[in-house]
Regions:
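Asp-based, Mg2+/Mn2+-dependent phosphohydrolase catalytic module
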Residues: 1-5, 18, 33, 120, ...
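N-terminal helical cap/lid subdomain that shapes the substrate entry/recognition surface
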Residues: 2-117, 130
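Conserved phosphate-coupling serine/threonine residues in phosphotransfer and NTP-handling enzymes
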Residues: 12, 138-140
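Residue-level marker of regulatory loop/turn positions in helix-turn-helix DNA-binding domains and
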Residues: 115, 137, 169
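A short, Lys/Arg-enriched amphipathic alpha-helix followed by its capping loop at the start of a domain
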Residues: 122-132
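Conserved hydrophobic beta-strand within the GNAT/NAT acetyltransferase core sheet
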Residues: 134-136, 193
């Protein structure tokens, strides 16, 4: 029986392409601002590709789709070291800049977030009608994730914030599943992880949770079907999926 659900945020609850996909280009422009104008576009294209962004497509196994800010910064730092070592900042300084620039694009400049279903109503239904605990497991920071949930008026239903602030394990470390389960006084096997990337599914399995993939983000069916325990098109189908699971359980009884 499912008693708790961890949601990935980007690509699962909100549209990854419309939020993060549109932010990547402007952020890279600012990070490469000190490079010669004539080569900047070439460097930008190559850097985006190293992050797993190929024109309008985003590789679900690429850095941009699932890595933490620190890991993304490592990719950018190594790229700058290779191409323009004379412009290379301290890694911690670059990390701060990467975080700040993305925060400007995906938080400060936004007044709303494109979603796949009304998140507040989904969380309300899960909490009040299904008696399920709701949490987030995201590689985004707490400040960014909280602002997003506040904007969607859904923060009040979130009782576990698995964010990347340097104090908690990050996906795919299954210890984060264990921490969520402990905080909810349930077993990891009673927890459902909902996400849009193969990394989300590996994370679920590492923590002994059920891995439910959604096809609304970067992971397409050929990426997800071999790693997910089950698949749905988007979180809009989650209540019906849960009803189906309840029916299966009652049928066995």
């Amino acid at each position: 029986m499912i008693k708790g659900i961890l949601f990935d945020k980007d690509g699962t609850l909100i549209d990854f392409y419309k939020v993060w996909g549109t932010a990547a280009g402007p952020v890279m422009d600012r990070l490469l601002a000190d490079c010669h104008t004539g080569e900047r576009e070439f460097l930008k294209k190559e850097l985006l590709e190293r992050l797993g962004i190929h024109d309008s497509e985003i590789d679900p196994e690429g850095a941009f789709a699932w890595m933490t800010y620190r890991e993304i910064t490592d990719v950018i730092w190594n790229f700058l070291k290779e191409k323009h070592p004379e412009l290379l900042p301290e890694k911690q300084e670059l990390l701060g800049k990467v975080q700040n620039e993305f925060y400007k694009e995906v938080v400060e400049k936004r007044r709303d977030y494109p979603v796949f279903t009304e998140v507040k109503e989904l969380f309300r239904k899960l909490t009040e009608e299904y008696g399920v605990k709701v949490g987030l497991a995201t590689t985004d920071t707490y400040a960014s994730a909280r602002t997003c949930m506040d904007c969607l008026d859904a923060s009040g239903y979130v009782t576990f914030w698995g964010t990347d602030d340097g104090t908690l394990p990050v996906k795919p470390d299954g210890k984060l599943v264990e921490l969520a389960a402990e905080s909810w006084y349930i077993k990891p096997e009673e927890l459902l992880m909902v996400g849009d990337t193969p990394n989300d599914m590996r994370f679920a399995h590492n923590g002994h949770a059920f891995a439910l993939g959604v096809l609304s983000g970067t992971g397409k069916i050929h990426h997800m079907e071999c790693v997910a325990d089950d698949l749905i098109e988007s979180v809009a189908e989650l209540p019906a999926w849960l009803e189906g699971k309840r029916g299966e359980k009652n049928g066995r009884n």
